[in-house]
């Protein structure tokens, strides 16, 4: 859907969805679109995973999510000299004794690359955090949270 320019005060992109776009060119186009639909001074809030940490430490499995109803397993296959990682998931539905599996490629976008793309799209006041509490970015944590403005 196309939105009018300068329509929104805030745009959100959470849940590591941005990196489903599999090239920097695609991400740049999306970010420029977000910039266009924000009102002057509007805010863009973004959350992906901290791929500097994931790649640097060769993290191959994300924390297990388990409730009384489901068990959700998430793994990464890191490929040498390839900006894409293979993201594999298994969702076990306990009551039905059924497992649904999936695999997709994600662009392992590092923090410096993301900041550069945001700047190229026109964003300013770019701040990155290690979580939604706005704790300092860096170190061994999975989230990468961004706040920036038009």
Predicted regions and their residues:
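A short SAM/SAH-binding and catalytic strip from SAM-dependent methyltransferases
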Residues: 9-25
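Short conserved AdoMet
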Residues: 22, 39, 150
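SAM-dependent methyltransferase
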Residues: 45-117
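Short glycine-rich, flexible loops that bind phosphorylated cofactors or substrates
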Residues: 2, 19-20, 53
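A short hydrophobic/small-residue beta-strand
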Residues: 44-45, 125
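A short glycine-rich, Lys/Arg-flanked "PGG" loop and its adjoining helix->strand segment in the class I
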Residues: 28-40
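A short acidic, Gly/Pro-enriched loop at the edge of an enzyme's catalytic core
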Residues: 1-11
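C-terminal lobe and adjacent flexible extensions of AdoMet/dcAdoMet transferase-like proteins
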Residues: 107-150
């Amino acid at each position: 859907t196309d939105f009018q320019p300068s329509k929104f005060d805030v745009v959100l992109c959470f849940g590591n969805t941005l990196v489903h776009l599999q090239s920097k060119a695609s991400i740049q186009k999306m970010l420029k679109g977000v910039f266009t639909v924000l009102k002057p001074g509007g805010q863009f809030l973004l959350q992906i995973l901290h791929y500097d940490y994931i790649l640097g430490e060769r993290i191959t499995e994300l924390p297990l999510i388990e409730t009384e109803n489901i068990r959700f397993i998430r793994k990464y296959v890191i490929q040498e000299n390839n900006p894409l990682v293979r993201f594999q998931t298994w969702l076990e539905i306990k009551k039905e004794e059924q497992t649904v599996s999936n695999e997709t490629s994600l662009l392992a976008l590092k923090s410096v690359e993301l900041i550069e793309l945001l700047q190229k799209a026109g964003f300013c006041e770019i701040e990155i955090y290690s979580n939604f509490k706005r704790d300092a970015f860096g170190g061994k944590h999975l989230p990468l949270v961004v706040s920036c403005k038009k």
